[in-house]
Amino acid sequence: MGFRVCVIVVFLGCLLLVPEKTMAQEMKRASIVIQGARRVCETDENFVCATLDWWPHDKCNYDQCPWGYSSVINMDLTRPLLTKAIKAFKPLRIRIGGSLQDQVIYDVGNLKTPCRPFQKMNSGLFGFSKGCLHMKRWDELNSFLTATGAVVTFGLNALRGRHKLRGKAWGGAWDHINTQDFLNYTVSKGYVIDSWEFGNELSGSGVGASVSAELYGKDLIVLKDVINKVYKNSWLHKPILVAPGGFYEQQWYTKLLEISGPSVVDVVTHHIYNLGSGNDPALVKKIMDPSYLSQVSKTFKDVNQTIQEHGPWASPWVGESGGAYNSGGRHVSDTFIDSFWYLDQLGMSARHNTKVYCRQTLVGGFYGLLEKGTFVPNPDYYSALLWHRLMGKGVLAVQTDGPPQLRVYAHCSKGRAGVTLLLINLSNQSDFTVSVSNGINVVLNAESRKKKSLLDTLKRPFSWIGSKASDGYLNREEYHLTPENGVLRSKTMVLNGKSLKPTATGDIPSLEPVLRSVNSPLNVLPLSMSFIVLPNFDASACS
């Protein structure tokens, strides 16, 4: 039986602007073998996730204040483009949380403290006071989230009732009353929450604060009991429990799972900011270095191993990842070049059994998928949307004889039989002709071709557009992504020669492939990304 295959091809380089004579100086061949007989692991159906944070408009880093009005408490939820950008995913998982979530008070029940907005305060965590979520705003958020069809993960305050001991360490029992009142209100209104997450970056040595694994584990048992009681007689589906939303430290995570015990925590989350600080002058160099990008694979592997050994009832998620911390890198995180890091992260994490990957942020900072204020999609938005539409749950093993710069990931196609490949080429000079096989049969041969100019090379893949090739044979779909005008720091992504921008009516543009005969050569350009669909690929794991 024939199967359809999707290939995602991503090309990276080390220059920000690459002239035509530099791209395609070297013609190389590479063979790819997809092991389609079995799935090595599976992601969640809604693997792609984006976050909404709590930062006020005056949150600043490096003398820059890139947040504006983009947070849970102050974002304009009536903007049509924001709604359409989320709806395009059908659905998008949204995680509400961030550094200030452990200072949020919920304005419900018998609240004994004033419910005021976040204000700058030198003695406060991350330089801010405690803040408040009014139920009127919670109602507005849920109306918005329901209208967009979002799958919601909400991060709860895990410091309520605790006190500071020394340094970053906090102690004392968690006060669950305000959280329980908040959950009761949420259920009484019929608001659908997929998952409740407990705390943000309190694990191990912590970031602004830390809580011991012993205390954390015991409090998770309390929270699980609260969730069970609140949802016991409700028609709503009981949400899963997610924790701890911090940076992975093996000993702390192991102890947390041992203390909380079987079936308390459903999902174990960790955060990734493997590119370092947002003002690092080496940020671009790191994105373009395959050996650097590969270093974080050990974290994905170790998290999964810790869960398998000490909490096999739970699943691993990346609960937050923005590449560069402290709001991201200006003119990097919001440009085309960041998709090289982002798509590599999606492929690598999925290969290590990560079920969900939450991008920091949907809106806010320099790393937003959408531009703050205008909500115009940045390049990574389209990378996320194409992944979500084309990459299925099943992860396959794949090998290549290509150089280290050519990185390869494989998935079953989404919503249809077939396989999806993600290829990342970190060379700014090599133009590859790729052959694809299942280890037995060559599906796509690498055919020799003469060296051509960049313009000729781009024209050829875009020559057949439509639902059927002119010769009537089976086609593959190709989605070629390039930066506008060849500038890697461009804020505009180009799909098959067409700039991706909201339409005149304010809609997300359609993402249409070009069609080519499956027998024609598959050519992959430097510094570009491509999704390619191949029919008749023998992958029984994807039937």
From Swiss-Prot:
GO terms for biological process: unidimensional cell growth. GO terms for molecular function: beta-glucuronidase activity. InterPro entries: Glyco_hydro_79, Glycoside_hydrolase_SF. The active site is at E201, E320. One of its GO terms (cellular component) is plasma membrane. Gene3D superfamilies: Glycosidases (3.20.20.80). Pfam families: Glyco_hydro_79n. SUPFAM superfamilies: (Trans)glycosidases. Its main location: membrane. Its EC number is 3.2.-.-. It is an enzyme of class 3 (hydrolase). It is a peripheral membrane protein. Keywords: Glycoprotein, Hydrolase, Lysosome, Membrane, Secreted, Signal. The keyword Ribonucleoprotein does not apply. Residues 1-24 form the signal peptide. It is found in: Lysosome membrane; Secreted. Glycans are attached at N184, N304, N425, N428. Belongs to the glycosyl hydrolase 79 family. Endoglycosidase which is a cell surface and extracellular matrix-degrading enzyme. Cleaves heparan sulfate proteoglycans (HSPGs) into heparan sulfate side chains and core proteoglycans. PANTHER family: HEPARANASE-LIKE PROTEIN 1, HEPARANASE-RELATED. This is Heparanase-like protein 1.
